[in-house]
Design a protein with these regions (language model features):
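Secretory targeting signatures
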Residues: 1-35
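Short loop/turn segments that connect beta-strands within beta-propeller blades
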Residues: 86-90, 128-132, 168-171
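Conserved beta-strand positions in repeat-built beta-propeller and related beta-rich domains
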Residues: 71-77, 109, 114-122, 156-161
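Beta-propeller domains
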Residues: 72-96
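Beta-rich, blade/repeat-based domains predominating
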Residues: 56-67, 100-111, 140-157
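Blade-loop segments of beta-propeller domains
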Residues: 90-125, 132-144
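A short helix->beta-strand "capping" segment at the edge of beta-propeller domains
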Residues: 38-56, 90-91
Length: 173
């Protein structure tokens, strides 16, 4: 699979046509400005305060800053891994590759460990945040896309509108 074919329904022509139709319908049903609908949304400006070089070959799936270090997970079969990146210059501090049968996805940090989802394997890999050694793994049903820790639970996405709240110690929901 190529980098853009990995998303099961997003790569299909039908999916593209469907998404385009929904977009056109939503645009045509949306008022041209907020005053027409009576709603007033606060406009915010975003300014870029710094840019840092990044590996253009990395198919980034997850990012998290922990203890001043940027943790990045990368995807693609045979090229997935986890790396620690210096936030000041974008250099890779250390990195590990994962088994080529896994497609790395989102990551989060819990108890000094990095938890990385895999796309279709139903496996979450657990890494030591210091040396990136594999500490263990959890199993789950379905696809793994994104994950975060909200202070109480691991919140996991499978790419749909469904979020799964999991116990961070057992990975059970």
């Amino acid at each position: 699979l190529t980098s853009m074919e990995h998303r099961s329904y997003m790569g299909s022509r039908l999916g593209t046509v469907f998404c385009s139709a929904i977009l056109l319908l939503s645009i045509s049903a949306t008022p041209l400005n907020a005053s027409e609908s009576g709603d007033s949304a606060e406009e915010r400006m975003i300014s870029v305060i710094e840019t840092v070089p990044h590996d253009p070959g990395a198919f980034t799936q997850g990012l998290e800053i922990f203890n001043g270090i940027l943790f990045e997970s990368t995807g693609l079969y045979g090229h997935s891994g986890l790396r620690k990146v210096d936030t000041t210059d974008g250099s890779v501090i250390s990195q590990v590759s994962i088994d080529g049968t896994y497609f790395g996805e989102g990551i989060t940090i819990f108890n000094n460990s990095v938890i990385m989802l895999t796309w279709r394997n139903g496996t979450a890999l657990v890494f030591d945040s210091e040396d990136l050694s594999v500490e263990g793994e959890f199993s789950y049903q379905g696809e793994g896309w994104g994950i975060c820790f909200n202070g109480d639970f691991l919140v996991m996405s499978n790419g749909t509108s469904l979020l799964t709240f999991r116990d961070p110690d057992s990975f059970e929901f």
